[in-house]
Amino acid sequence: KKFGGFLXXI
């Protein structure tokens, strides 16, 4: 969850 929920949630 670094970029608003992009990357899957990282």
Swiss-Prot record:
Keywords: Secreted, Toxin. The keyword Transcription regulation does not apply. One of its GO terms (molecular function) is toxin activity. It is found in: Secreted. Expressed by the venom gland. One of its GO terms (cellular component) is extracellular region. The keyword Signal does not apply. This is Toxin To58. It comes from Tityus obscurus.
